[in-house]
Structure formats: C-alpha cells, structure tokens
Amino acid sequence: MITTEIKRVKNHINGEWVESTGTEVEAVPNPATGKIIAYVPLSPKEDVERAVEAAKNAYETWSKVPVPNRSRMLYKYLQLLQENKDELSKIITLENGKTLKDASGEVQRGIEAVELATSAPNLMMGQALPNIAGGIDGSIWRYPLGVVAGITPFNFPMMIPLWMFPLAIACGNTFVLKTSERTPLLAERLVELFYEAGFPKGVLNLVQGGKEVVNSILENKEIQAVSFVGSEPVARYVYETGTKYGKRVQALAGAKNHAIVMPDCNLEKTVQGVIGSAFGSSGERCMACSVVAVLDEIADEFIDALVSETRKLKVGDGFHEENYVGPLIRESHKERVIGYINSGVADGASLLVDGRQIKEDVEGGYFVGATIFDGVNQNMKIWQDEIFAPVLSIVRVRDLEEGIQLTNQSKFANGAVIYTSSGKHAQTFRDHIDAGMIGVNVNVPAPMAFFAFAGNKASFYGDLGTNGKDGVQFYTRKKVVTERWF
C-alpha cells in the first residue's frame, strides 16, 4: 500500500523481514518531485551469506516438491499479482517515474512471465528414445541447479525480476534476489505477495544494496547461476566475474536499437510507432528505438510528421494521465543526458526538438523532454553510446542495404525494426540484420515470455537468454541416461 510516510526498507531472509546488519543507507527519491520516499540499506556481504544459507537450507525440501505442486503455488501467486495490478502500477510510477500507462503495461508483461513459469511441468519434460542399441534405452532428465541469484535494474522493477525467480523456483531452485537500490519498494511488494501465496520460507530471499551485494553474489560458492540485466560495462563485469567463480551466467546488457523506415511504410503508424518506442518510459528501456535510419526518398516527409507529433507530447509526473514523458530516474542521469544533447549539438547534428527546454512546470523532478536530432553520423557519441533517455537520432540513408550496414556497425545488437509494406524488404532485413530480436512493423520487438529474450554482440553475455525454453535450460542441468536391464 502506498503511503506518504518515508519508508525504511528491509531485507527478506528465511521468510522474515529483517534489518540489514550494515549501517549504510541510500535515499530513494520520487523522480518526479525529488522528495525522499524511502531509505534503502546498502547491505554488506554478511547479509548475502545469510540469504544464501537460508536458500540452501530451503533447497533441500523445495527441490523435492513435485513439479505440479510447485506450479499450483505459482498459480496462486499469479492470482495475487492480478488482484493487485493497480497498486503495483502505482508503486512503479512512484519510485521509477514512468507513466501509469507504461507502468500498467509493465505489470502485465510481468504477469505473463509468471504465466510461463506455471507451465513448468511441460517445459521441464525431458527426452527419451528406446532401443538405441540392443536392449539399451536413452533418455535426458532435467534437474534444478540449487541456489541461484538474480540482479535486476531500476527500469523494469516488476517485469525483470519476474523473468527470473518464478521460473527458477518452478524448476526446483531457491533464489536470492538483488533488485536495484533505486527501486526497492516494488521488490518488497513482490516478495510479500510471494509468501502470501504460501511458499515455504527461504525459497525466495531479497537482499537490498549496491555493489557489495553484487560482488558477494558473484563470489559466493553456493550460488550456482546468476541472471543479470543492466548496462553493458556492468553486464560484462558480472559475466567475467561470475564465470571466473564457476557460475552459469546470463547477462543482458545495453542497446542502441535502430529502426529502418522504408518509403512504402504506413507513414502515420510508423510515426506513432517510433514515438512510442523512442519516448515511452522516458526512453529508459533496453528495447527503446534510439536511431532511425530513414531512406532519402521519404526522409523529409517522415521527419516533418515526427517532429510535429513529438512537440505535442507533454512532460510531467507520471501520475497525471495527460503526461507522456515522465522523469528520468535520478538527477545525475538527467545531467548525463543533457551532456549527450550538448555533445550532439557540438558535433554538428541538427537539433530539431530540444528536450532541455521544457515548457511545463516540473520543478524538483528529473525531467528531460523528447529530443530529436537530424544529420547524425557514426562518428558522433549520440550514435555510438547508449544514452538511455528520450533522445532519438536520425540518419538519412540511400537504400535498405545502407540502412542495414549502418545498423550492423553498432557494437550493440539487441533489437532492430523495419517499417515497410514489402515482404521482400522484410525478409532481406530479417536475414541480414545483426540483432537478437527483430520487429517488422512492431514498435518494440520484445518477445512474449514464451520466447527467449536476448540480444547479440555487446548486448548479451552468455549462451541462454531469459524466458521460454532458454530460461528452463538455464535454470536446470541435464543428465543423459543410457540404461540396459538384464
């Protein structure tokens, strides 16, 4: 329940809310106002060790619970999440800043991830082949790993944790969760509802904190696997450190997603699609459109329409329905984004819409409005770097081939989109673009939870993505049995 009092956030270990054993805390502001809404502990290594011990003890019994029984408990959790959708959305808007509409969409995507986890009995089924040789049968069996952990970012405080712990727990593992210290309140509510669903103590443990918690998770010998979503430098660090300590790691990293706009596109729908992808959730998502490669033939018409519609977008508190662009997560990130806008201007890009100039009264909040650059090239930092904000770069290209070449020059390869009415163009794009997730006239090509989610190149470190069959394979180990009976 949302209140006006400043909350002191706790850890949840072995089925109980407990104070951190450390003394260091960090203030959690509402990004729309700058006012403090909570204090979160920066937990020390000892808290992680307690959580891991609780998870290890719980694993001894939880791993023996029949798979259908685990699934039934997740159905109860799913029901509770659905019953509390409005409250969960409001918590997200309060501590993350995204609009209620965007928050509600995130809640729904999180619920869909739990729906996937409830199907664990089907997803965990192995394989068998009788009589592979004279009187010999072969089969593959899947078993849980043990204690696993998840490290999640601020930008999707509900959806991304729900990619991780429900599926891991459905597979028979126990879990240690470290969510972003910037959005601790939603994590608390997810854990409360989890135990309200009747799960045994210690199956899910929550440790709040920063880098010390991350390092403690990566170095703890009892943790068998780590799931991570965050920025590229940290993802690389998590992958390299976790694997050094013998862990299975999936680390989803940064992005610089491109959209190619063809002359045969539906112009009106393309403009609205690019706006939604680039400026929704204030651009703070790894699937946001950051660059549009528009063909010369339609460039002026597309850009005129895009700029006209973008200037209509209102900036402000996400609780107010009329606002489209909410705040960025922190003042420091706002200053970083303004630095990128200044860089684009200095490098010679044409600033068509300036998000530094906000006409609405947003005093106290961390706001940058929708921003559009034209005349961008590959030598500019605004093309090269992940800005993680409502900043869109436009590059004019001669044809589809040049658009694909431009996109593939990025070190990132998370998502890519083409807007076209040509099946041939779509097939060429699909076959030659280097991206893990591809959209054809789909604004944000993030797949549903029953498909795997992962990028390529510097957007992903690991072998198995989150969700779908990849997720089940990540959270289980297989045993291949060859047997003969006399």
UniProtKB/Swiss-Prot annotation:
Keywords: NAD, Oxidoreductase. Gene3D superfamilies: Aldehyde Dehydrogenase, Chain A, domain 1, Aldehyde Dehydrogenase, Chain A, domain 2. It holds the Pfam family Aldedh. Its EC number is 1.2.1.27. It is an enzyme of class 1 (oxidoreductase). CDD domains: ALDH_F6_MMSDH (cd07085). It comes from the Bacteria. Pathway: Polyol metabolism; myo-inositol degradation into acetyl-CoA; acetyl-CoA from myo-inositol: step 7/7. InterPro entries: Ald_DH/histidinol_DH (IPR016161), Ald_DH_C (IPR016163), Ald_DH_CS_CYS (IPR016160), Ald_DH_N (IPR016162), Aldehyde_DH_dom (IPR015590), MeMal-semiAld_DH (IPR010061), MSDH_GmP_bac (IPR023510). The active site is at C286 (nucleophile). One of its GO terms (molecular function) is methylmalonate-semialdehyde dehydrogenase (acylating, NAD) activity. SUPFAM superfamilies: ALDH-like (SSF53720). NAD(+) binds at F154, K178, E181, R182, S231, E386. It catalyses: 3-oxopropanoate + NAD(+) + CoA + H2O = hydrogencarbonate + acetyl-CoA + NADH + H(+); 2-methyl-3-oxopropanoate + NAD(+) + CoA + H2O = propanoyl-CoA + hydrogencarbonate + NADH + H(+). GO terms for biological process: inositol catabolic process; thymine catabolic process; valine catabolic process. Belongs to the aldehyde dehydrogenase family. IolA subfamily. HAMAP family: IolA. Catalyzes the oxidation of malonate semialdehyde (MSA) and methylmalonate semialdehyde (MMSA) into acetyl-CoA and propanoyl-CoA, respectively. Is involved in a myo-inositol catabolic pathway. Bicarbonate, and not CO2, is the end-product of the enzymatic reaction. Homotetramer. This is Malonate-semialdehyde dehydrogenase. It comes from Bacillus cytotoxicus (strain DSM 22905 / CIP 110041 / 391-98 / NVH 391-98). The lineage of its organism: Bacteria, Bacillati, Bacillota, Bacilli, Bacillales.
